[in-house]
Amino acid sequence: MTTSAASQASLPRGRRTARPSGDDRELAILATAENLLEDRPLADISVDDLAKGAGISRPTFYFYFPSKEAVLLTLLDRVVNQADMALQTLAENPADTDRENMWRTGINVFFETFGSHKAVTRAGQAARATSVEVAELWSTFMQKWIAYTAAVIDAERDRGAAPRTLPAHELATALNLMNERTLFASFAGEQPSVPEARVLDTLVHIWVTSIYGENR
């Protein structure tokens, strides 16, 4: 926690500034973890690394988190909820009736949110195979986002803007799973992958074509 120059100047001589609060320490641990994940996987990061980076002792670390895996779970939970809240805001305040822009805005929520936290995204995806908590967190929100997508597809069909082709929920599932794999491959620079600068346009094209195209 920092204090402004003005508040520091008003402190009596010889007094120490306030110690970091519990919230500050927790945030410091989370920030340290995200920074370290930029350079190496969670398996190569120790609790001592996290404690040292946060400016606390190892015993103090365990006051806030039971393990480094719990730190990752918290980081991923924050990113996932950030994306979910942004999508909820869009759903409650629709700003564009153009169908391509409507879907672009929604997909961009995930592109921007997860793209701003690539290290956490990579670590979270890797942890799904070994962490029940991470897998459940991701599954819960994917199901929520798929249900929302299906509801929008149904609404577009009900107003006559989109044809009734594949079942909406199945189409929404395939599109969201495609987003997940394609975005994360681009963020990680995998080969093959769509270049990050073009991945949003690519996904929007596929979504619009799939939702509004007729069966052949």
From Swiss-Prot:
Inhibited by tert-butyl 4-(3-thiophen-2-yl-1,2,4-oxadiazol-5-yl) piperidine-1-carboxylate (RF1) and 1-(thiophen-2-ylacetyl)-4-(3-thiophen-2-yl-1,2,4-oxadiazol-5-yl)piperidine (RF3). One of its GO terms (cellular component) is cytosol. Residues 1-10 have a biased composition (Polar residues). It comes from the Bacteria. The keyword GTP-binding does not apply. PROSITE patterns: HTH_TETR_2. Residues 1-24 are annotated as: Disordered. This is HTH-type transcriptional regulator EthR.
